[in-house]
Each structure stands twice: as structure tokens, then as C-alpha cells.
Amino acid sequence: MEAPNRTIVEQMNALPGTDYPATIGGQIETPRGVLFMGDMTDSSQETDWREFERVYGLTGRDGLLKYPIYEAIGNHDIIGDSPIRAHVKRRHGALAYSWDWSDVHLICLDMYPDSGTRAWLAKDLAKIGRTRPLVIFFHYAIEGPYSDFWPQADKEALAQALEGYNVLAIFHGHFHHAGHYAWNGHDVFLPGSPRHASHQFLVVRLSASQLAVGFWDFDTRAWRDAFAKSIQR
């Protein structure tokens, strides 16, 4: 899988100055970072993690990618006595963590938001208030193919936990297909994968009044799709 991942990194590095799709308009500025929706490894091996570090890097300075990575744990990262959890905890302090980019609050909810992660989420949300713009990401799918990897009760509890908050978007991985759907009033995006046929990644722009998402096909080196909506920040 090294070749397609190197292709992804090469094209991500070349993004600044690229025109967005016409329906979005403007040019891509230097990305602040890359959200990685899990499965940094295939079989949870230390050698897999080292390969991830070598190709992508973690900080924007230690690998080939020029931007820092913010990763969620995937199910391929927790097989057996996996060292990957420890690496993520060492980097971020926990498997669920948050940070701010200007006024936007970004939240990683581990592989999926189980009861323990939701308890942490409630405390995190209590600190920022209901009007702060939120971007949320984790690994497992909420709806569609392969969405039965976590209980429906946990999904309903997450919907309740987010009720009344200013959620701009939710991103997840797991299903190796790029796309967008609505869930409980929230826009949910899937970024695609170097594995299987959906060879895409997402480019996201947040302005004062708009969330825009471009779907970049790294096989054809062209935009596959685009999404935009008005937001309040």
C-alpha cells in the first residue's frame, strides 16, 4: 500500500494554490492539518506504525506530508496486543481528545463514542458552550454499509449528546467509500481510502459563512464532487 499512500501525500502537499471546484470557488490555502479517520495500520503491528510515520509523518516535519496529522483509532489498529493505542495516547493524551483551530473546536471521539467517551464528551462540550462551531470525527460508520460495528443505542445517545450544539460536520472512516449523508440533522462525510475503488480524500474549507467540502480523486487528479452549505460562526 505504500505506492498509493505516497500518491496521496504528494497530492496533498501540492494542494495550496489549487482551484476549488467551480461550485465552491476560490483557491486552496495551506491546510492546517489532516484528520485521519483510523486504520493507520493494517494489522496493528509496530512495523505498520513505523511505515505510517515514514510515509505520512505525524507533525508535518517528520515524514513526507507537510501538514500535521490528527488521528482516530480504527479497528485495524487494535488487533491483539496492539501498540498503536499507546502511540496515539502518547501523542494526544488520550484516544478521545480535542483542540481549537481559531474559533472552531475539533473533537476526536476514539474509534466510536461509547459510554466512557460520551462522558468525556459531555465534559468537553460543557467547557465551550452551545454556539461554538464543532467538527467531530471518529472511525466507525453511523449509517450505511458496515455501520453495525457499534450499537444503535450508542448512536442514539450520541445524537442526544450533540442536540443543541453547533455541529458543522461529522467525519468517519471504516467504509472504504467517499460520500456524504445526513444523520440527525448533521452533515456526515466519508473520505474514501487507498484500498479498494474509492480513491478520494476530502479538502475542507471553513469560512465565516460557509462549510465547503471538495472530493479529490487521486487517481484522476481531479475533483469528483463538491458540497457547500451556509453556516454560523
What are the roles of these predicted feature ranges?
Residues 38-39, 74-75, 139, 173-174:
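Active-site glycine-centered loops adjacent to acidic/histidine catalytic or metal-binding residues
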Residues 1-48, 233:
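N-terminal active-site segment of His-dependent metallophosphoesterases
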Residues 27-30, 215-224:
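Short, solvent-exposed aromatic-acidic interface loops
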Residues 24, 128-146:
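Short acidic, glycine-rich surface-loop motifs adjacent to enzyme active sites
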Residues 10, 45-133, 154-166, 177-214, ...:
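Extended active-site neighborhood of metal-dependent phosphoesterases/phosphodiesterases
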Residues 136-142, 168-178:
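Histidine-centered catalytic micro-motifs
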Residues 1, 145-154:
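Short, flexible/disordered intra-domain loops and linkers
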